């Protein structure tokens, strides 16, 4: 992510940047794991420990602020029971770290975690999966777009 940030931003004049990092950072991986993506929360090591996550977020925020855009951070969605490479509760810890960084910089947080904790099991691709079916993704998109509209102070669509 950090290596690609300048390329992704390019020289575009951004009005708003709504971003998230975290779900892949808190994942535990092990080269011998059988689960997709080498996920293994028992024998694996965390991709990006919380202290490094905080430093990375700080770097990202400082770079994004240089664009002059309004910045919105979307916190990490819920980690359900049974996820092969993620521990329930790590989502909360990483969101706390992110909230501190965003507060230091006056960046609003779009609370996608709170939204996804209300999702019934049928909105997830399968039990123990952090991914959503299209209807779940639609609900996320609705909240994201509402927050962006609010930040841009645009009139709401009827």
Predicted feature residues:
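Alpha-helical cap/lid subdomain in secreted, periplasmic
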Residues: 3-158
């Amino acid at each position: 992510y950090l290596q690609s940030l300048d390329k992704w931003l390019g020289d575009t004049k951004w009005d708003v940047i709504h971003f998230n990092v975290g779900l892949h950072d808190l994942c535990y991986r092990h080269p011998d794991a059988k689960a997709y993506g080498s996920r293994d929360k028992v024998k694996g090591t965390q991709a990006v420990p919380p202290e490094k996550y905080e430093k990375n977020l700080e770097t990202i925020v400082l770079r994004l602020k240089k664009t002059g855009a309004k910045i919105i951070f979307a916190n990490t969605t819920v980690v359900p029971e049974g996820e092969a490479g993620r521990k329930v509760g790590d989502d909360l810890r990483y969101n706390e770290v992110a909230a501190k960084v965003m507060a230091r910089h006056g960046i609003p947080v779009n609370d996608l975690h709170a939204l996804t904790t209300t999702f019934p099991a049928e909105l997830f691709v399968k039990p123990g999966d952090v991914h959503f079916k299209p209807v779940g993704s639609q609900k996320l998109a609705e909240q994201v777009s509402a927050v962006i509209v609010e930040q841009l102070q645009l009139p709401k669509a009827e």
